[in-house]
């Protein structure tokens, strides 16, 4: 899904969840939205196809806010050091 489609889904009020998930070079954004037959989970894509990877969570926040959303979840599993025990 690309940003224009996300904006349409936001305006329709069918977006249920937005998740930022670590990728090799940054963060991918997954969108869960309602459909006629239930729910669907789609990744945010670049204009020319392929997964859109954001370098920072700030960049994710700007894109999410620009689409009309006010919140998203961050998953840290898979980050370097995320599974390390606290000192």
Functional labels for PLM-detected ranges:
Residues 20-48, 69-81:
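Short aromatic-glycine-(Arg/Gly/Cys) micro-motifs in beta-strand/loop hairpins
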Residues 1-2, 56:
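Residue-level preference for nonpolar/small residues embedded in alpha-helices
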Residues 6, 11-23, 35:
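N-terminal intrinsically disordered, cationic/polar leader segments
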Residues 53-68:
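A short, charged, amphipathic alpha-helix used as a generic interaction element across diverse proteins
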Residues 4-5, 59:
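Short Gly/charged-rich anion-binding patches and loops
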Residues 81-87:
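Short terminal or interdomain "cap/linker" segment that borders an active site or interface and mediates
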């Amino acid at each position: 899904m690309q940003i224009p489609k996300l904006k349409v889904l936001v305006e329709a009020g069918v977006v249920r969840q937005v998740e930022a998930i670590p990728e090799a070079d940054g963060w991918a954004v997954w969108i869960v939205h309602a459909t006629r037959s239930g729910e669907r989970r789609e990744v945010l894509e670049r204009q020319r196809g392929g997964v859109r990877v954001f370098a920072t969570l700030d960049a994710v926040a700007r894109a999410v806010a620009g689409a009309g959303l006010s919140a998203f979840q961050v998953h840290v599993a898979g980050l370097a050091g995320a599974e390390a025990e606290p000192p």
